[in-house]
């Protein structure tokens, strides 16, 4: 069987790594990198760290409106599918690359498999939610991470092709922890910060960066907390920090340590050694949960509802008072932890399903 895998954003590379490794033991795989966020050279550290094969095709789409990105991807992916004639198109998550790949394949009557199917935030204002729903409804094989995802699909009338395989990001995280043992990261020494004596923060979503009031609230909460906060700054976040003149303000406060974005392994290292995590990233919420690190989510909803139900993740949006309150007071009890994301063998289960098609 020939499988075309479509990715374009860094969280997808993390999901791709264990699955691709398993796929290549049994099938032919062609990887398309859409370049939705960055070109391959910018993303090369992820491919190298995670030992992902070099993509067969790099589309270099770059940034742009949702319509522009999706349309350009759709055209170029269709050309490749017509040339490669795969038996299956495999897509991950909820990006524009996901929906473009699924649409291109389905219109050519190629089977679509969706990894991370069934997730719902129930907020149709989120572009990711639209991508998730549409992709699920045109996919033939739906690989879900949780029972909640299964229920979501069935509530929407999807009753066949659902396979609960657990979460592939847990596969990646377990592998990352093994690789980190062989590394000697110096970042905490360079920042003069001890393990479990800092909070790790990430901010990148449009609702938090593009709206000045929201970004100001978040940054002011970070400053006023007086906690040591390590803050890897996403390029779009940096752009808006500079635009709103918050970048200069931050430099006056020693508790807030701004650093450049880091690779996957170093990010897991920072997450694992943080006493708490502040984020608006879906992937980081989940990694925090896997690592049993309390997470304060700078959003009003989440697709990872299990992390909230277990009491290890709390949603605060961009409300400064709520952020400050939970920086100081949010400390989940270990007995509430009820892990339900699979056993770290999701990639094996996915390939077992594909082998039995």
UniProtKB/Swiss-Prot annotation:
Keywords: Isomerase. Its EC number is 5.1.-.-. Pfam families: Epimerase_2 (PF02350). Gene3D superfamilies: Glycogen Phosphorylase B. The keyword Isomerase applies. SUPFAM superfamilies: UDP-Glycosyltransferase/glycogen phosphorylase (SSF53756). InterPro entries: UDP_GlcNAc_Epimerase_2_dom, WecB-like. One of its GO terms (molecular function) is isomerase activity. NCBIfam families: wecB. Belongs to the UDP-N-acetylglucosamine 2-epimerase family. This is UDP-N-acetylglucosamine 2-epimerase homolog. It comes from Methanococcus maripaludis (strain DSM 14266 / JCM 13030 / NBRC 101832 / S2 / LL).
